[in-house]
Amino acid sequence: MNLMRTAMLLAFMTALFMGVGYLIGGQSGMMIAFVAAAGMNFFSYWNSDRMVLSTYGAQEVDERSAPEFYGIVRDLARNAGLPMPKVYLYDNPQPNAFATGRNPQNAAVAASTGLLHALTPQEVAGVMAHELAHVQNRDTLTMTITATLAGAISMLGNFAFFFGGRRDNNNPLGAIGVLAAMIVAPLAAMLVQMAISRTREYSADRRGAEICGNPLWLASALGKIARGAAHIPNEEAEGHPATAHMFIINPLSGARMDNLFSTHPDTENRIAALHEMAQYGGGTGPSVGTPTRSGSTGPAMTANPERKSRSVPNTGRGGSQPPKGPWS
């Protein structure tokens, strides 16, 4: 189903490029747009995950630079029966996380330093289990390509503005065609994001609860992340709104028009579904354990709302120690 959805998105992207190219430059513009779309589709499949990670300045971590966080992801991947993904951290105070990659063998999960500061290890486990559920459900290819293509579509309006007014462009509809391209392209970018069904978040919540072993860990994390996202801006996401659907919670501020086309279901509804799952005994699989120095899995983490993850690399904000881990 996800492969079919991805193919449909790629076809839509190509058709949109060709349509706007025709409005701007007639048949020659349409052919140029077709070649550009084909190249972009190929590039997106192989490189869109790297582009997203680079956009947020994510840096890969391992057992030495972020031992507890890395250990949590390792144990969760084992619980899910997945290959070990690459693990990334990006320096941002807003608590959030996302997954990317074209398949489980080439997957990556990323969390913000704000997430590790704000959440307990149990809540971090719930969040990363949700992201691994996206990997297991093969949502990541669709999500990552959509982020790249939606950003490209939004640029078509500017393309129409700068090149649509030339007299030698064979535009069959004149100024009307250019105006239509300027209006339709940004709207289509939003619709592409909405093409990723909201139900994938509910599915990832349920599977994530099964992977980590406790739906309430994820429910608690969602509440904290939503409150943090509402008050702490994410400047990178604000500058690249096409990537918003990749995050566990919409990272855009509530004042943005983009939220009229939200790609996420209501957080309270997601939390309620997880509480209902816990009430009926769902998600009672193996709990993620605390990694020991030998690399084996110790006892399951005990819930302690006051405890913060020890995996947070010191970024030097408010601390006397120099930066550690990926920021050393």
Swiss-Prot record:
Membrane topology note: Multi-pass membrane protein
Binding-site list for Zn(2+): 130, 134, 201
GO cellular component: plasma membrane
Organism: Rhizobium rhizogenes (strain K84 / ATCC BAA-868)
Protein name: Protease HtpX homolog
Chain ranges passing through the membrane: 6-26, 28-48, 145-165, 172-192
EC nos: 3.4.24.-
GO biological process assignments: proteolysis
Subcellular location: Cell inner membrane
Cofactor: how and how many bound: Binds 1 zinc ion per subunit.
Disordered as annotated region, ranges: 279-328
Ranges of biased composition (kind: Low complexity): 287-299
Gene name, Swiss-Prot/TrEMBL: htpX
Assigned protein family: Belongs to the peptidase M48B family.
Cross-referenced Pfam families: Peptidase_M48
Molecular function GO terms recorded: metalloendopeptidase activity; zinc ion binding
